[in-house]
Amino acid sequence: MNAAQLLGEGFTLMFLGMGFVLGFLCLLILAIKSMSVAVNRFFPEPVAAPKPAATTAAPADDFSRLKPVIAAAIHHHRRLNS
C-alpha cells in the first residue's frame, strides 16, 4: 500500500466513525424526546392552585411596630456578644 491509499482509508474510516457517532447522537436525541413526551402524557404537571390575594403590607413610614423588634434584636445581639 502506498501513502495515498493509506490516506484514503484513513479518511474513509474517519468519516465512517463520525457518521456512526452522528447517527447514535440523533437516536439518543429522539429517544430522550420520546421519553419526555411519554412522561408528560402519563404524569402531567399538577394544576397550580390560584394564589390567595396578597395581604396589604404596613406602610413604609410606620415604624411604631418596628421599634420594639429592633430594640429586641439589639438587646439579643449585645447579650450574645458580651
From Swiss-Prot:
Alphabetical list of Pfam families matching this protein: OAD_gamma (PF04277)
A GO term from the CC aspect: plasma membrane
Alphabetized InterPro entries for the sequence: Na_pump_deCOase, OadG
Location in the cell: Cell membrane
Enzyme Commission code: 7.2.4.2
Keywords: Cell membrane, Ion transport, Membrane, Sodium, Sodium transport, Translocase, Transmembrane, Transmembrane helix, Transport
An annotated Gene Ontology molecular function: oxaloacetate decarboxylase activity
TM region positions: 12-32
Cofactor(s), names only, from the UniProt record: Na(+)
Annotated GO biological process: sodium ion export across plasma membrane
Recorded catalytic activity of this chain's protein: oxaloacetate + 2 Na(+)(in) + H(+) = pyruvate + 2 Na(+)(out) + CO2
Membrane topology according to the record: Single-pass membrane protein
Family recorded in the similarity comment: Belongs to the OadG family.
Physiological role: Catalyzes the decarboxylation of oxaloacetate coupled to Na(+) translocation.
Subunit (UniProt): Heterotrimer of an alpha, a beta and a gamma subunit.
Protein name: Probable oxaloacetate decarboxylase gamma chain
Biological source species: Escherichia fergusonii (strain ATCC 35469 / DSM 13698 / CCUG 18766 / IAM 14443 / JCM 21226 / LMG 7866 / NBRC 102419 / NCTC 12128 / CDC 0568-73)
Name of the coding gene: oadG
